[in-house]
Every structure is written in C-alpha cells, then in structure tokens.
Amino acid sequence: MKKTFLKSILLSTLTLVSLFSCGDGFKFIISGLDKPSDNTELKNSNSDDQNNIDDKNEFTIFSINDFHGKIEATSAYNGLLALQGAIRGNPKYTEDSPIVSAGDMWQGTYVSGFDKGESLTKLMNDFPISAMALGNHEFDWGFSKIESNQNKANYPFLCANLIQKSTKKRPDSIKDHIVLDIDGFKLGVVGAMGAELESSIKSSRIEDFEFSNDTNLLKNAITSCEDEGAKSTILVLHDDKDSTYTNTIQRSKLNFKGIFGGHSHSFQLEQSNSIIPYVQGGCDSNGYSYMTFSKTTGALKDINYVNVDSSMASNATMDLIQKTNNLIDSIPTITYGTSTGRWNKTNTTNFVLQAMFYAAKKKYPDKNYTTETLVALHNNSGIRGKFTSGEMTNKTVQTVSPFDNVVTILPNREVNGTLLETAGSKPYCRSYPNSSGWTTKRTMDIVTIDYLVSDRYSAALSPTKPTPAINLENDKGEDYIIYDVVADYIKYLCQDGNVINAADYN
C-alpha cells in the first residue's frame, strides 16, 4: 500500500458506535459506578472539565490491550497511528504519561506476523510503551520467540504467574514487575495472565510452562514494588473482569489500586466498595483505557475507557508515522485470487473448512474421500476475521487464519454432531459437511488442525486412538499450515480467472 493511500485511510473519519464489531462484537460492560472503593477518589465522568488534569499533582497512565497486530489502518481497524494519536490527544496525556500493554500484541495480521511480531515490538519502542504483560497469543510462536522479541524491546515483558516447570520459577527473561518514575512519583506495575488461559495455547508451545493461580506471586511482586519506593501499584492483567482468576485476585484483597485488563476484547469498567477497580479498552486498535492518580495521596482519581477515531492518526508523532509507513511499504502484497459478494464470519469459516477438505482429498487421492467418509473441523475462535469482496491477498488470509496450526488427519474416528462440534455443552466448532444434525455415530476420517488434536475436547479428537494422527505435508514435504491451505485453495478456485462467490459458502 502506498504511503499516500495509507494516509488517506488513516485520516478518514470512522466513528465507532457503541455496538460496533470487534471480531464478533464489542462488549460494553459498566458495573457499580455508584460505589467508589476505599482506595479511590473517582470522578468517573466523561465531561471536559473532568477529563482535564486538575493540577500538577495528578498523572495519568494509559493502557492498550489485544492489539493483535493491527498496524495498518483499514475499513475495520483504525491502526497503530490512530491509537497513538488518540492517546496523545487525550487532555490527560502529558509527555510523562506512561503507556502499558495488557497483552496479545503481535498475532493477527500479515504485517505483524511475517516476522512473528519483531517489527511491531520495535515500533512499540517508539509508541512508546513502558511495559507489556504477556497474553496467551504471545505464546503462539513459542517461548523462544517471546525471548527474541524481548531482546528487541526497550520495555520489559511482565508475567508474575508464568512458571517454568523444570525450575519451578519464573523464567529470568520475564519480569514480574517494574517501578515507573513519573515526574517524581513512583508507580509499581505488576503483570500477569489469566491462569485458566493455559488451555487456549497449543500444548506444544508451552510444554515446560504453566500459569499459576497462586496470588502470593502477585503479593510478592507488590512487596518488591514497595521496597523500590512505589507509592501505589497497579496490575496489568491479560484476563476478563469476570474470570475465575480475576475473581480470585479480587477475593485476595491485594493492594492494587487498579487493574488494566484484556483478553475478552471488551470495553469493561467496574468499580464497587468490595473490589479493585478494573478497566479494559476494547481491542484491535479501536480503543484504550486509562487511570489518573493523585501524586499527593497515591489514590486513584479517575478510571475509564475511550473509543478511538481513525482521524486521530493526525496526532501521531512524525517518527512513528515514518517508521510505520516504511514497515507497511516493505511488506509485499501477494494476490491469490478475487471474490465477490457479502462475506461474514460464518461463510468465511465454511470456506476455510472446504479448503481443508480439498487439501485432504488432494493429499490422499487413493482414499476417494467424499462427504460420507471425511469431515473437516475447525474451532470457531480460530477464525479471527472475515474475507472482503475484491482481491484475496496474503494480508486478508492472515487476518482470517493467523495461527501456525498444522492441518492434520485423524483416521477412523467414530463421530456424531455432539462429539465434533461441542466442548462440554457449548458450541465450539463448525464442520463440513455440517454435522450438527448427526444424532447417530458414524466412522469417518477427520481433517482438522493440530491445536484441536487433544483428549480434552472430545474422544473423537484423540491424537492416538484408535489410530495416530497424521500431519499433512505440503509439496515441499513440510508441515502444511492452515494459512497455506487456505491460500492454495483460493489459487485453485481462481485459476483461469474464476471469481469466488461468498454466497456459495453461506
């Protein structure tokens, strides 16, 4: 994309309404705002008077969460420059205002994913952010990549409850806290990730790690902050306000003045007498959150989230504008084919399933697979976006299927609709052909992704029973990942100038 075209998109007006989609939908949750807690002097107002800094005795810290690589501005995402510009345009912002991240920064787009978040990590040096809590998707490329990106960052990666099984300790490269000096006021920042989110990470990526729910790890980090002179301490937590781990933290009565949250892609704000104030600022560059503190007392005075408008890109720093444009211009656009019609999450998922089905048929022509002998299966949450009418490129495919999941065959599985499409009692997957109406069991091969190959979801997805799983290989003899499966299917369908119609996958 040319710089002039990028800037025209970045400077166009895109106002988010309160129910605008963030993936499947933004969620706005505000609870208990009429009950300030003991450690706050909250205003909780969006009025101009209260958005201005009252005097020199206040400072504001900002948080972003679940950015998911949305560097480039599009019709759906405001992009990195608008996010920085919106924060810098907030009346509470000063050059001393720190910015933190609550995780899930890298995974989600081709521009960020082509080098597994390294370039985005460097861009965030210039954003700048002061610390980043690890999210579950930071582990998508393995812990070695986290450490590699940490070496490129001028800010620490935080996760107090990350434990290495072999040592029973937190890895040396990951810190549990940092103390920020904000014009003479010392603020402790502790980072953590939801303990139950371990199940959302491919098991092979975290074989030697676990996420502890022991709140003593957080308590020890608070003590370290206080020993280093922190007058107040906050938690940057990659987790939803209603999660089991967050509730455990709340019940533990830890001395956090506030919690910046993430993971659920929501706008959440909660405040009451009995809890630590919690705020989450949306996702995908479309929002942020903040807390304002008194330098005199260390009390939390204001907490809120803010929608981002794409026109705020004009407030971004020239240095970040130049580096962002240079990065985007350096990434080639590869066109695989063309589509027409109205795409949504459902028909995009159906397309991916048929791509998997086609890949299995092509790999094993001797099996003569039909919809009576083969079923394709993919988890709903693994499809992260939707196609759009027009060119189908490397960037759009990466938005839909950003994970390095290997396509896998499970031979001779006994299945019905419940075994395939649910996890417990909840809808979890979609299949092709649609198995939701299958009430009687049948024996079929399953083509799926290795992330799902586990006894934890269904007996049908066992990696070993009755026969071992088989990873598909591409023409080079390498593991055939879902991104390449989708890209190759688009190229196959669009040969000889054919156009893919979204309606064919409804």
What residues fall within each predicted segment?
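Catalytic centers of hydrolytic enzymes
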Residues: N57-E58, F67-K70, K92, D126, ...
